[in-house]
């Protein structure tokens, strides 16, 4: 079994989740931060459950100049502004937390 030692080898894919009351501007707010930081959206899924938005994004930070910690802070601030919770984590952490 090969162990991945560097961030470059592990990849720069992240999972972003957005949960909260649906309103105008949520997707624009999240994707605006990603675009401004050269973070590419690889996949996106959203649904409205009654009045609540549930959105999951898979994104690639390979070309971004900011680190994941800074991105988390930026997204969290935007979430507070929009009245939703926005979380971001490395793909490996997400897989570990949601394994069966």
What are these model-derived regions, one by one?
Residues 1-100:
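A conserved regulatory-domain signal marking ACT and ACT-like small-molecule sensing domains
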